Amino acid sequence: VIADKPMSTRLSECDRLIEAVERNKVKFLLWNRNFLPAVIQGKEAVQSGAIGELHAIHVDFYFSKDAGPPKGTRQHGDPPINWLERQLEAHASVGAVGIEAMGELQIEGIYPLGYIRMLTDANVRRVFARTATHFHQVNVDNHVDDLATVSLELDNGIVGSLCIGRIGAASHPDIGEIKIHVIGSKGGIVISEARPEVSIHYRDQPPLEFKNERVANENDFLLVDNFARALDTGCEPILNARGGRDIAATVFAAVESGKTGQPVEVTH
C-alpha cells in the first residue's frame, strides 16, 4: 500500500490502518521527501558522527504556492469560499481533494516532521504550537491555518522546532524556503532541501514562474525502489504505517495546541 499525505484526518483511522496492515501482512509506505539529495547527504553527515551527539533540530518549510484569493479580498456580503470547490479547482488533475478543511499543519506537516523523524530517529513527546491564518481567504473562511510554528520535545533530550506555511507563488524563486538546521555536540549543519539547483532567467519571464529548477532529484524513483525492496526482502519502507501514525499524532497534538494555547502530549 502506498498512500499520499495526510495519512488520515483522524488518529483512530490511522490506528485502524495499522491494524489492517499488520493483520494482512502487507507493506505500507507513506509518501515523503526523505530521498531528496540534500536530505540524504544530511542524514549521512549525522550518522557519521560529524556533528557529534544530536541536541537540536529546526525545519523551515514554507511552500511558495497560492491557495486562491489572498486574505482580505472577500467583500461584504460575499459567501465564504467553499473548501471542496476550491480544492477541485486547484487539483483538477491530481489528489489532495476532501470535504474536511485542513490547514498547512495537516496538509504538509508530514514533510518537515518526516525529516525530523529520519534525522533524529526519535519520537516527539510534547508540542507547543502557534497557528495563524495570514495569507489566504479560503483558510480564513474555513478557520484553518496557513502559517504555524511548533516547538517539540523529543526522546533523548532532543529539542526541535518547525515553521510551516503556504506563502504565495510570487514569494520565492523556488518551490519555497525549505531548510533544515541540525545542532550537535561537535558542530552543526544546514541542509538546503532544494540543492542542487540551477537558476533560469530570461526576458519576459512570467512573474509566477519558478526561477530555480532542481536537478539530480530522484526522490520519486527512490521511494518506489525502497518500497519494492521492502516487498522483496521483508524489510520496512523508509516511512511505514507506524511511522506515519506517529507523525499524524504529532500533527493532531500541534493543531490542538494551536487552538488551546497550551502544550500537548503526543499519543504514541
Where do the model's predicted regions map?
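Beta-strand-loop-alpha-helix segment that lines the small-molecule cofactor/substrate pocket
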Residues: 1-34, 49
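Structural detector of well-ordered beta-strand residues that form the stable sheet scaffold
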Residues: 2, 27-29, 58, 128, ...
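C-terminal helix-rich "cap/oligomerization" subdomain common to oxidoreductases
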Residues: 13-15, 23, 229-268
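A general structural signal for well-ordered alpha-helical segments in protein cores
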Residues: 14, 39, 112-113, 220-225, ...
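Short, well-ordered coil/turn segments that N-cap beta-strands
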Residues: 26-27, 53, 156-158
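Predominantly a Rossmann-like dinucleotide-binding segment in NAD(P)-dependent oxidoreductases
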Residues: 34-140, 261
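Contiguous beta-strand/loop segments that form the cofactor/metal-binding neighborhood of enzyme cores
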Residues: 107-195, 221-233
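Short polybasic amphipathic segments
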Residues: 180, 196-206
